[in-house]
Amino acid sequence: MTNLQPMTTSPVLPEHEDDPHTFHILVLVKATRHWLDMKTEKRRVFFDEVVIPLLRQRPEIRMRWFEPEAFSTRASYIMLCETTDLSAWAWFCDELRDSLFWDHYFEVIDILPTFEANYLA
């Protein structure tokens, strides 16, 4: 049995201690057959030509891309975005929705906005 110790340090990551109001938005997506049939190089080109330029237009958003498909049947990928600007986030979502990302290459399963350790903020 594990002996639980009281928390003596903050669970908030050091890079967020200065701004506890950073939104962490998890976007669960399922790859469509269109995406799965593309070669890896063409997938990279799509991100380089569509997704990355959108992020460059909104530097308030940082994005990471995870691949849980070996562990989950619900989502092929999880996009984790961080921002303090929900207007920038809404713009980014609208732009993705108007591109081949949304519904053509990926089915957006869920969007989960969160705060890190919100109960302590």
Task: Put a short name on every predicted segment.
Residues 1-75, 84-91, 112-121:
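Short S/T/G/P-rich N-terminal loop/turn motif that feeds into the first structured element of a domain
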Residues 79:
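Conserved, mostly hydrophobic/aromatic
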Residues 96-105:
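A common structural junction motif
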Residues 105-113:
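A short, structured active-site edge motif that brings together acidic residues
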